[in-house]
UniProtKB/Swiss-Prot annotation:
The keyword Hydrolase does not apply. This is Large ribosomal subunit protein eL43. Zn(2+) binds at residues 40, 43, 58, 61. InterPro entries: Ribosomal_eL37/eL43, Ribosomal_eL43, Ribosomal_protein_eL43, Ribosomal_zn-bd. Disulfide bonds: none annotated. GO terms for cellular component: ribonucleoprotein complex; ribosome. GO terms for molecular function: large ribosomal subunit rRNA binding; structural constituent of ribosome; zinc ion binding. Part of the 50S ribosomal subunit. The gene is rpl37ae.
Length: 86
């Protein structure tokens, strides 16, 4: 089977020509943001990974916390809300 990712379409290359360009672009933006490593609100290391729908765990300190469905927090002010204003 041929490689399904290209530089332009990224992980949505697995869909091929299906579903239309607009939907694949939206999925691409969410998946890139979802799969990157996020900053831990407890130890501030860049080691947070998504375990399940809305559940995240820091690989460094081991803390588990909840967040949004696809990424732990949308904006920086939500990150500080998790930290308790610190």
């Amino acid at each position: 089977m041929a490689f399904s990712h290209t530089k332009k379409v990224g992980p949505t290359g697995r869909f091929g020509p299906r579903y239309g360009l607009g939907i694949r672009k939206r999925v691409l933006t969410v998946e890139i943001k979802q799969r990157k490593k996020h900053v831990c609100p407890f130890c501030r290391s860049k080691a947070v990974i998504r375990e399940a729908y809305g559940i995240y765990r820091c690989k460094k300190c081991g803390k588990q916390f909840t967040g949004l469905a696809y990424y732990p927090y949308e904006h920086l002010h939500e990150y500080y809300k998790i930290r308790g204003g610190q």
